[in-house]
Amino acid sequence: MVGKGLPVLKNALKQLEGLSKAASVGTAEVIQKAYHQLTKLQAARLVFAYVTLVLLYVIMMLILTSSVIDLVGFSTPHRLPPFVDQAQLKHFNTAQDTLMIVFVALGVNFLLVILVFLIYLLIKLKHIEAPLSGSMSYFAHPVLKYIFGIMSFIFVFIITVFSILRITCADANTLVQDLELLSNTSFADTNFTNAAHAAVSGLLTNCTAPHTDIAKCGYSGVHLLMSLESRTRRLWTGSTSGGLTEAGIPRMLTAVGSCWMTKEVVPVILLVMFILYMFLHLWMVIRALRRRRLGTIIEDEHLPLTSYEDGELDEEGGADNLLYAIPPGSTIPGMRKWNYTPARA
């Protein structure tokens, strides 16, 4: 008997293979079957499937956001100053509102799917690893399993928020240029907020709705005010209808600054989270592969457990005449069926 957890592990494997509690099994067989049951069959495949799902989702969201923004931008090239085509600008606003709804719905649904899969993974791993010691489990410590789950879901959540913000903040750099031209101040200047507030306030006085008079508004003013009329950009100003108002200028300036900051900070956060997430998973994979090189691991994963009932072993015949096969059709979960007949002397 090796370790306090070995009896529990033996009983668990007996239940998996349909053996009676009184059946005796060898320690080497227990280690072999527990190893294959955990790392090669169920636990490793579940974790790999979850990691694959997360990475596919991340790749999909990054490609989709970049693609749709580029496609909408290419279809409306003349919406930007200094030659603002108002029809194209309205088309861009409509497309942005539609994409915003689509990505919010897509992101929320995928978050729920990944969360359900993560909960299933943690419950399944807890069930599989319950009888095993830390040295034999896929995760070295139970806490590491939850750290892995929390980190992965935070990573997915950040990707989702970042994808939605990329749609919301599309054209934000052009709006910053509009504000710089209107205020004659650099965005990096400490006085930019005050100067931009005064410039936009004066613009609203001279450039009345529908903000299409190039002579009074200028190309930058037309682009700025018409861009803020979209439903997506109304979230920036708190306006329920129409476009920018005097009361919404501070919120608009804050939103533009936040979008600019998002484009600088979020990619760094994503990169750090991705590196940590992949290093953690890589460490677990290497740990599993190193265990496969142990001399106690038998390569034939399809050998069923052999057993004999306590008290029935005699010295003359040994255990060979009492060996029996696993009932036909029964397998360890995840292992292919076999037809095993013990060799007779």
Curated annotation (Swiss-Prot):
Keywords: Membrane, Transmembrane, Transmembrane helix. GO terms for cellular component: membrane. The keyword RNA-binding does not apply. The chain crosses the membrane at residues 46-63, 101-118, 147-165, 265-286. This is Putative membrane protein ORF59. It is found in: Membrane. It comes from the Viruses. It is a multi-pass membrane protein.
